Structure formats: structure tokens, C-alpha cells
């Protein structure tokens, strides 16, 4: 069982696309795509992690 992770090293980005590929964060919030999720990770100073791919 491997931990689920996303590489957010190239974030934050000012604009995210409207692409819908949901990710569920450790805050139990569904993020529309990697960009939205990674921006939130950066904002949280790394406290937010990926729970799983798909909607929460």
C-alpha cells in the first residue's frame, strides 16, 4: 500500500484550467483538479495532503 501523492513542486499557479479530474484532500474537500489542489497545498504550508483520487 503506497501513500497517494501529487507533485506540487511547480505550484502555485495564478490560473487553473477548468479541467475536471477531482482529488480528495485531507480536509475532506473535493478539489476540481491538480492545479486547484496544489494551490491549496501551497496555501496550507504543506499541511494539506491528498486523501485519494476522485471525489471525497
From Swiss-Prot:
Site (Reactive bond 3): residue numbering on this chain: 18-19
Domain of life: Eukaryota
Keyword Kinase carried by entry: no
SMART domains: KAZAL (SM00280)
Location in or out of the cell: Secreted
Organism name: Callipepla squamata castanogastris (Chestnut bellied scaled quail)
PROSITE patterns assigned: KAZAL_1, KAZAL_2
Domains as described in the record: Avian ovomucoid consists of three homologous, tandem Kazal family inhibitory domains.
MF GO annotations: serine-type endopeptidase inhibitor activity
Cysteines engaged in disulfide bonds, as pairs: 8-38, 16-35, 24-56
Listed Pfam families: Kazal_1 (PF00050)
Ranges of residues in domain Kazal-like: 6-56
Keyword line: Disulfide bond, Glycoprotein, Protease inhibitor, Repeat, Secreted, Serine protease inhibitor
UniProt-annotated glycosylation sites, renumbered to this chain: 45
PANTHER family reported in the protein's UniProt record: OVOMUCOID-LIKE-RELATED, SERINE PEPTIDASE INHIBITOR, KAZAL TYPE 2, TANDEM DUPLICATE 1-RELATED
InterPro entries listed in its UniProt record: Bifunctional_prot_inhibitor (IPR051597), Kazal_dom (IPR002350), Kazal_dom_sf (IPR036058), Prot_inh_Kazal-m (IPR001239)
Protein's name according to its UniProt entry: Ovomucoid
CC terms in the record's Gene Ontology section: extracellular region
Amino acid at each position: 500500500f503506497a501513500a497517494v501523492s501529487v507533485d506540487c513542486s511547480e505550484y502555485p499557479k495564478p490560473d487553473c484550467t477548468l479541467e475536471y479530474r477531482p482529488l480528495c484532500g485531507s480536509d475532506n474537500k473535493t478539489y476540481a483538479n491538480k492545479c486547484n489542489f496544489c494551490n491549496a497545498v501551497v496555501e496550507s504550508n504543506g499541511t494539506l495532503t491528498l486523501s485519494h483520487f476522485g471525489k471525497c
